[in-house]
Swiss-Prot record:
PTM annotation: Glycosylated (possible); but there is not yet direct biochemical evidence for it.
Localization terms from the record: Membrane
Single GO biological process annotation from the record: uracil transport
UniProt KW Transmembrane helix keyword: yes
Protein name: Uracil permease
Length: 633
């Protein structure tokens, strides 16, 4: 056997499998007679035997208990490092990949279309959605005008979610990885860090809001004056010992659910989806019955705006729905990557989001109107209505009803916190420190930080804080616009997976510079954010800050402005300054759609082969060479 075909069990970093050996042997031997052909077949048999023996030896070595030179090294390798498969690679290579960042293999792609229906049925039942109609009603719209804006707003939301989901459905990628295609390998950390910060803050705020249904459950069991029976030694002017106890109960009860793998968390949403209809319609029927069948819909608004005032009230109500959903649009690939087929996350989301959220908002409107008929006050929060029920009629039936509905609200907040905050934070943290943090650790980090930032102080400081959280949609919409333009217009659905996990020279997504920055994405992002900044500052800043009416109106349209400007400016920049790895020469005139259903079950082997190469320049010769035979969709 020639030397170049011998298999040596040495410390070489190059890996050689049987297929590569046989390909090498095909180049070395060119049998042109019977004797040479016999020798060739004999050599192939020897190769196979040696490869088998090598494999057996490696399995035996790997099964032996590893030896560490010190106790601290054992701690480091056994408990600090989360992905042992990337121990032998460089620091930069380990940043590219871990088990939570890799494309989702077939075994974990278990979400069918009905799982997405259950997911959104579960998501629509939360405290924020019940109150979303208050924006339009307080601006002067009547109930049916407000409901129309909700249908339209969530219709747009459904479309944006479906667009953002597509890259996850086809290539099985999470947002931190898919954003590398548009922002660049390393500059993609900017939107990722944005999501981490917002996820932690929102997790903390949502957990603090969930303290109220926990409080209602406790009062249903131990008495409506329970908060007066617990001495206040907390030492904070913004929260009592009782309030912190309720917050901590919810926070601690959430921790086990943070350890559930993302592809299995669908079971939580299935359970939640079963409970939600009973709680929603049960609450509505109960409220109407207590109001003796009367609903004071006319009490929901005082004045009716006309002309341009009505138009802007209509638009602001519509935009409130979209801003409320800005985080979930960005998060869409984190869930769509688990879909069984490309269409599992398509029609189910496009139809369910506007339908389910609009029904929930209508129930919220009717419960508020029934509450006014009973108490003469518009309680926009459903929890305030339940609190009033408990305080005015403390009997067995009321206690049981309040407990059950509050329990569903608490479960709803748990599901929302996982889907919108902890899971996205865990996924993003695993992209920042893939060697040391996986989704479970990232989710627990999110929960720990949520406790540390003391949300009761944030919520008590000013209503400006909650405004700032909602207004942050101007930054998220600009990210979503860039990602959408890059995938659908510039790349026409084409992603080269080996390149998106590589920082080597020639990787499409390094954009020709060692910093992995796509300057077009940065410029487009700033174009989307800049027009809305003056209005944002005026809305969340000091009362003395004044801006023009035009600046405020741009801010009211922030989601459309941010998304539209970033989308169009990125498309224009890529037209004049083409990006690498684009399957068409002219992104405006050329036609074609190059998305494919990626087979990624053996992707780890492909990735390891890729990082052993000095560069990927040869891959730039043809976009289609290795994947043209795959099925395009």
């Amino acid at each position: 056997m020639p030397d170049n075909l011998s298999l040596h069990l040495s410390g070489s970093s190059k890996r050689l499998n049987s297929r590569q050996l046989m390909e090498s042997s095909n180049e070395t031997f060119a049998p042109n007679n019977v004797d040479l052909e016999k020798e060739y077949k004999s050599s192939q048999s020897n190769i196979t035997t040696e490869v088998y023996e090598a494999s057996s030896f490696e399995e035996k070595v790997s099964s032996e208990k590893p030896q560490y030179s010190s106790f601290w090294k054992k701690i480091y390798y056994e408990y600090v490092v989360v992905d042992k498969s990337i121990l032998g690679v460089s620091i930069l290579d380990s940043f590219m990949y871990n088990q939570d960042l890799k494309p989702v293999e077939k075994e974990r792609r278990v979400w069918s279309w009905y799982n997405y229906c259950y997911f959104w049925l579960a998501e629509c039942f939360n405290i924020n959605t019940w109150q979303i109609a208050a924006t339009g009603l307080q601006l002067g719209l009547n109930w049916w005008q407000c409901w129309i804006t909700i249908w339209i707003g969530y219709g747009f939301v459904g479309a944006f979610v479906v667009l953002a989901s597509r890259v996850g459905s086809a290539y099985h990628l999470s947002f931190p990885i898919s954003s590398r295609a548009s922002f660049g390998i390393f500059f993609s950390l900017w939107p990722v860090i944005n999501r981490v910060v917002m996820a932690i803050v929102w997790y903390s705020v949502q957990a603090y809001i969930a303290a109220t249904p926990v409080s209602l459950m406790l009062k249903s069991i131990f008495g409506k004056d329970l908060q007066d029976k617990i001495p206040d030694h907390f030492g904070s002017p913004n929260a009592t010992t009782y309030e912190f106890m309720c917050f901590f109960i919810f926070w601690a009860a959430s921790l086990p659910f943070l350890l559930v793998p993302p592809h299995k968390i669908r079971h939580l949403f299935t359970v939640k989806a079963v409970l939600v209809p009973f709680a929603s319609f049960g609450f509505l029927i109960w409220a109407i019955r207590r109001a003796h069948g009367r609903i004071a819909l006319g009490s929901l608004t005082d004045v009716q705006p006309h002309g341009s005032a009505f138009s802007w009230a209509f638009l602001r109500s519509l935009m409130g729905c979209m801003a409320n959903f800005s985080t979930m649009v960005i998060n869409a690939p984190d869930f769509s990557r688990f879909s069984k087929n490309p269409n599992s996350a398509l029609w189910s989301q496009l139809v369910c989001i506007p339908f389910l959220f609009s029904i929930t908002c209508l129930i919220g409107i009717l419960v508020t109107a029934a509450g006014y008929e009973i108490y003469g006050i518009n309680y926009w929060s459903p929890l305030d209505v339940l609190e009033k029920f408990l305080q005015t009629t403390y009997n067995k039936g009321t206690r049981a009803g309040v407990f059950l509905i509050s329990f569903v609200f608490a479960v709803a907040q748990l599901g929302t916190n996982i889907s919108a905050n902890s899971l996205s934070c865990g996924t993003d943290m695993s992209a920042i420190f893939p060697k040391f943090i996986n989704i479970k650790r990232g989710s627990l980090f999110c929960a720990a930080m949520a406790l540390c930032i003391c949300p009761w102080n944030l919520m008590a400081t000013s209503s400006k804080f909650t405004m700032a959280l909602s207004a942050y949609a101007i930054f998220l919409s600009s990210i979503a616009g860039v990602v959408c333009s890059d995938y659908f217009v510039v790349r026409r659905g084409y992603i080269k997976l080996t390149h998106i996990y590589s920082h080597q020279k020639g990787s499409f997504y390094m954009y020709g510079n060692r910093f992995g920055i796509n300057w077009r994405a940065l410029a487009a992002y700033l174009c989307g954010v800049a027009p809305c900044l003056p209005g944002f500052i005026a809305e969340v800043g000091a009362p003395a800050i004044k801006v023009s009416d035009g600046a405020m109106k741009l801010y009211y349209l922030s989601y459309w402005v941010g998304y539209g400007l970033s989308f169009s400016s990125y498309t224009a920049l890529c037209y004049f300054f083409p990006v690498p790895g684009c399957p068409v020469n002219n992104i405006i005139k050329d036609k074609g759609w190059f998305q494919r259903w990626a087979n990624v079950d053996d992707f780890e082997e492909e990735w390891k082969d890729t990082i052993e190469r000095d560069d990927l320049v040869d891959d730039n010769i043809s976009v289609y060479e290795h994947e043209h035979e795959k099925t395009f969709i």
